[in-house]
C-alpha cells in the first residue's frame, strides 16, 4: 500500500504546474524553508508561499481520497 500511495503522490506532483512543482519539491522533499527556496529560484517569499498553497490545493483536489493520509505523513 505504501508504494502505491507514494507512486500516486509522485504522479500527481509531476502534473503540477512547473513553478509550483519546483517550489513544492524544494520545500517538502528537499527540506528547504521558504526563504531558501525563494533565494534559489530568485522569487519572493510570498510567491513561494502562494505556490505551496496552490500545490496543496491541486493535490487535495486530485487525491481527495488519500489527502488525509498525505496530510498526516507530510504535515500538509
Residue ranges and their predicted role:
Residues 46-49, 63:
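Membrane-interacting alpha-helical segments
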Residues 51-54:
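Residues within the DNA-recognition helix of helix-turn-helix
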Residues 3, 28-29:
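Substrate-agnostic recognition of the 12-TM MFS/MFS-like secondary transporter fold
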Residues 1-11:
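Acidic, proline/glycine-rich intrinsically disordered inter-domain spacer in sigma factors
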Residues 56-76:
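C-terminal edge and immediately downstream basic/flexible tail or linker adjoining helix-turn-helix-like DNA-binding
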Residues 11-14, 18-22, 30-47:
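Helix-turn-helix DNA-binding module
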Amino acid at each position: 500500500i505504501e508504494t502505491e500511495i507514494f507512486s500516486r503522490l509522485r504522479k500527481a506532483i509531476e502534473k503540477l504546474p512547473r513553478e509550483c512543482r519546483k517550489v513544492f519539491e524544494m520545500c517538502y522533499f528537499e527540506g528547504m524553508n521558504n526563504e531558501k527556496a525563494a533565494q534559489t529560484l530568485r522569487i519572493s517569499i510570498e510567491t513561494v508561499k502562494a505556490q505551496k498553497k496552490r500545490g496543496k490545493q491541486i493535490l487535495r483536489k486530485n487525491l481527495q481520497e488519500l489527502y488525509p493520509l498525505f496530510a498526516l505523513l507530510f504535515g500538509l
